[in-house]
Amino acid sequence: MTKTKAIDIIGAPSTFGQRKLGVDLGPTAIRYAGLISRLKQLDLDVYDKGDIKVPVVNIEKFHSEQKGLRNYDEIIDVNQKLNKEVSASIENNRFPLVLGGDHSIAVGSVSAISKHYNNLGVIWYDAHGDLNIPEESPSGNIHGMPLRILTGEGPKELLELNSNVIKPENIVLIGMRDLDKGERQFIKDHNIKTFTMSDIDKLGIKEVIENTIEYLKSRNVDGVHLSLDVDALDPLETPGTGTRVLGGLSYRESHFALELLHQSHLISSMDLVEVNPLIDSNNHTAEQAVSLVGTFFGETLL
């Protein structure tokens, strides 16, 4: 596996997987913060495919539930469209960089990617496990369920997108500090490789990422998807996200993590999710996100 020089940027401006308006503006905020020019300065072939068309938010229906799930029909629509766009990028041998939007969009992106690999690995860089199922979800918010859906459990219509499920043993969770009871049990039952914030404190981010790389190589993965939720970072530094949990990764730690992942040449696709400019300060979180992506694609000081 090698890092491709050809990148497709795909916006997925979904706000339907959670309750706070504004995360649908994430792709625009990230572009406004200079993403395209930042990547082109690295001599990369960058094509912005624009945003997929998403349903209009109906405020009266925004908090309604179907099958115990919020905005279920809208999320199906978003993920079906995103699945097609990401599949097209993979088929054209381009690196899909998907901009959320809330984390429910990972169902569409990762399910598309997994069809093109025999043994895909996933790095879930997040404060949360996103391993809930509807029956156990405290909120009914689908942004807390995408990784469980990708392993083959969840609502039927979303599972239909995913013909090649992700093996739990091919998943690495990094930055965990807020897990629901059912998620903790699922992690234990399936022995999912997990680095909590306590582990990161003990080991340091360098050892965590090096262990992650070696672990996925030992699993003989033929591609690795990086799903980066900005709520993995500490909200005191990175405030523009909707599900904040104190005590997260620092901006500096995250830079180093992405630098190491770049050097590994292991990552074959990426999501960047949960940037919400309406609760940010002067687009600070989007600017941080752009800097992190630049580092991931090889940007250095010297």
Swiss-Prot record:
InterPro entries: Arginase, Ureohydrolase, Ureohydrolase_dom_sf, Ureohydrolase_Mn_BS. Its cofactor is Mn(2+). Pathway: Nitrogen metabolism; urea cycle; L-ornithine and urea from L-arginine: step 1/1. GO terms for molecular function: arginase activity; manganese ion binding. Mn(2+) 1 binds at residues 103, 126, 130, 229. Keywords: Arginine metabolism, Hydrolase, Manganese, Metal-binding. Binds 2 manganese ions per subunit. It catalyses: L-arginine + H2O = urea + L-ornithine. Substrate binds at residues 128-132, 139-141, 180, 243, 274. One of its GO terms (cellular component) is cytoplasm. PROSITE patterns: ARGINASE_1 (PS01053), ARGINASE_2 (PS51409). SUPFAM superfamilies: Arginase/deacetylase. One of its GO terms (biological process) is urea cycle. Mn(2+) 2 binds at residues 126, 128, 229, 231. Its EC number is 3.5.3.1. NCBIfam families: rocF_arginase. Belongs to the arginase family. This is Arginase.
